[in-house]
Amino acid sequence: MAAAVSSVWAKPGAWALEAEEHEAELKQQPSPTNQKSSAEDSSDFPSLAAAATTKTKKKKGQTISLAEFATYGTAKAKPAPQTERLTQAELVALPTGPRERSAEELDRSKLGGGFRSYGGGRYGDESSSSRWGSSRVSEDGERRGGGFNRDREPSRDSGPSRADEDDNWAAAKKPISGNGFERRERGSGGGFFESQSQSKADEVDSWVSTKPSEPRRFVSSNGGGGDRFEKRGSFESLSRNRDSQYGGGGGSESDTWGRRREESGAANGSPPPSGGSRPRLVLQPRTLPVAVVEVVKPESPVLVIVEKPKGANPFGNARPREEVLAEKGQDWKEIDEKLEAEKLKDIAAAMEKPNEKSTGKMGFGLGNGRKDEERIERSWRKSTEHSEEDAQEEEPAVEGAKKEETEDKPAVEEAKKEETEGEQAVEEAKKEETGGEPAVEEAKKEETEDKI
């Protein structure tokens, strides 16, 4: 192949064909790994025919006793997992208390030990004042607390923590008497860890019982109504404490709402209210007359019986035929009998006439029969409401029918005469035919004689 490729006179593209042939040969040669994998695949996933032919080996039965069979189905209790226990030597080697610390470790465990050298001195130059939680330096050089380290002195960091010194350090607090609402100076301390006041809940279980109750002031009313006790609100003691603290000359009543109302009333010209109470409203007298409202008692309700409308009548205002004839003074039975008698007469007359089906002149009887049938149908289709009028109209109709019958009688007689005349003509024709037969026989005889 190399020689063919290296030859100068080889066809262009011959090397590509040789490469394809070589790849096809390599593909046809199965590799040993492929053979192994194919054998494993055939065993794991046999074909349907192989799976049907191969038979699985049956396991031999195991003989057990009846007692074992009875206890075989019961669930056996699983043994509890045995935990690995320490040996006696390991138990003795375990520590029984905290390890004694050295002096260096004690120094390290103090508050702020790991952050002393971070960012320069803690309270040194002013460059550290820009950090969050650091001390603030004012213009006059006085240091004031800021952040979580408010009012913390440098000497506090060198000492041990209060939590390490005493288990219950809150009990060693000294209660400082003072009002909780007093305003503190801006530069004074009082952070989270350096609060100067002690909670009342820590001192006494029920501190409400020790709260001094302020007596009500005995105030005399100027209006002559007698003396009374003045009621104070819960916030008046706070206002009095503020006045005493700041030295207000107006007294505790200068900041109350009652005093302000009195001052506003005096400015408007109205008399001041007595005892700091709300001023009474002075309304303008009524000028319009009072409308008299008359109370009208409702009358007793009148029961109105309303007939329920019946369902819609599909026939409208139509009434039975019997009722209409009874109002007119006529008997409907007599009218029905008359109609039936006329009907029977018409039927009998129609039955007497012959039913002829011939054409031409013989068709008069059919026409008369049709007229009779139409007249009968017309008589039965009349409305029941106008029965009287119909009965009156039927009288001339019956007379006209009788006249038609009388007029039709000569026509029928003429037709019968024509029929008889026709029958005679037919008989004459038959006679003529019979008379011509001997002449034919004579002619036949003459022919036979001539032949002889």
Curated annotation (Swiss-Prot):
GO terms for molecular function: mRNA binding; protein homodimerization activity; translation initiation factor activity. The modification N-acetylalanine is found at A2. The keyword Acetylation applies. Residues 387-397 have a biased composition (Acidic residues). It comes from the Eukaryota. Homodimer. Nonspherical monomer. mRNA-discriminating component of initiation complexes. Interacts with MAD2. This is Eukaryotic translation initiation factor 4B3. It comes from Arabidopsis thaliana. The lineage of its organism: Eukaryota, Viridiplantae, Streptophyta, Embryophyta, Tracheophyta. The gene is EIF4B3.
